[in-house]
Amino acid sequence: MDFALEQAGKNRIELEKVLNYYQNDSLKLEAARFLIRNMPGHGGYEDDRLDSVKAVMKAAVELNIGGYLPDSEWKRKWIGFNYRTLPKRPDIEYMSADYLIENIEQSFKVWEECPWAKNYSFDDFCEWVLPYRIGDEPLDNWRKMYYDRYKPLLDSLYTGNDMVEAVNVLARHFKRTNLFVLTTEYRMPHLGARFLSEYLVGTCREITDHAVYVFRALGFPINIDKYWYSPSNQHDHMWNVLKDSDGGFIPFWYMDSSDFVVKRGSTDGRKKGKVYRNTFEAHDSKTASLFGPFYQDVTAEYFGENEFKVKVDDNIEGNSSLLGMFSPSGYVTVDAVPLRRGKARVNNIEPGVIFQLLTSENGTRSPAGCPFMVVDGNVRYFEPDMSKAVTAHIRRKYPLRQYLYGYMATMTGAEIEVSNDRYFRTSELLCCLTDTPRTNLNYYYPKISRPYRYVRFTPPPPAYPTADCRAEIAELAFFDSVDSEEHLPSKAIYGGGPVDENPAHDIDKACDDDWLTFYYSSGPQDSIVFDLQRARVIKKI
């Protein structure tokens, strides 16, 4: 506490106002002390340039165009903007007494009135409900705003006392009704509660932030977990976690697959390697120098506690090493581990994931031993033996996880029709995709014997209001023989315009013999029509 007040400098008077305000309320005083004690290191970015980028991001939501931001001079101007060049406003130097008091009062209000408050302790309340910020977002008086908006909604959806079911009902409602626009085009700090209350645009971070604001405003103990890299999808990812009444933790992300449910024992199926939790309290851990003091290693909550002694190369010196995972763009550091007597002490890792011990010199990561993986409680090393090469037929590069299955399920119900009239005033159904594709290359064998010149692909109707069912095709080819390897000549002659009016996703990309280009329609259920040049009997698609 003394350190925090010293760091406040001239702003110390504001923080002491809060402490004096609660001098006769021991519990709220301790809550204030918790926030002030852990305030050093927290801060946010507030700048007119951030508002300019947000204006571009708003447009995607206002135009309801889905996962792309509309092209504009504004968009091109800010595409390379990096917020980290801006000055950061330390909370300890700018926090007002009024803001902190309002945050504490509103937090205690919901804690005292909600039926699930009895499920968690005061310490849990301080870490899981009380914090006024998540990351580096601009500060808003968000608690009452979110409470007033979502408390009536929760009451209309659920009136019981089961905390898990209450979260499940509200999260599933968001899944069905919230329009979320995915974009990774801008490097921005956390967007903030007020912005996200109107515009859900960004990445998984913005969905988890929105959920934290909603559920904490209603008294639910909610936090955010993340991994830095997953071999399942080659990215980082974050999701929400609910602290259960039995002390356990329930992970969820409400924009996950269409059959998403908040329930005990659930998992998204992604490999995680190492898992970290976002915290308001600072932690003096071995990874603080890597990720900052506001992350806590919680891998053991997902995979149990474990420890393994892993061999390192003989030339490795020092008393510590880095633990990493391989990615196509280089190694991703996920932990720091001690070295003792020529071995690394690696603890709390996910079995079945390949890791790599690393050294770091001038910012360059280099292997410090063979890759390894834990299998059945033992360390398995991957040491190459070129005398035992084998040939493998690989159908997928990555496992078919639930979220990928959800993407591919949007093809279910799509129809392919044929006609000799380019405007399809009469047509015959050639094929209907009745099941979710399992991979990106699929063959279908029509039973029609008549020749037709024109083919039309139509995506399925949306399963729920915010579902994205636009045409998205990398390649659609037609064959006059089931044994033929050479497809019939075809040309996309008309269809819905490409998303964002981007020529890179125009209709010609659906039949250009390049699997890495694709047609992506701007509107829902936009069809695309192909001309086979003359009437043909289609035996294979």
Regions picked out by a protein language model, each given a short descriptive name:
Residues D2-G9, Y21, P152, S156-H173, ...:
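Hydrophobic/aromatic-rich core segments of domains that either
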Residues E6, K10, E14-K17, N24-L200, ...:
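Secondary-structure boundary elements
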Residues E305-D314:
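A short, amphipathic beta-strand motif
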Residues N319-V337, E417-F424:
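Short amphipathic beta-strand segments in non-cytosolic proteins
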Residues K343-Q356, S360-G363, S449:
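Short Pro-Gly-centered beta-turn/loop motif in secreted/extracellular proteins
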Residues E361-S387, C469:
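Structured interaction patches on ligand/partner-binding surfaces of diverse proteins
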Residues K388-L429, D435-K540:
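Aromatic, loop-rich ligand-recognition surfaces of beta-strand-rich domains
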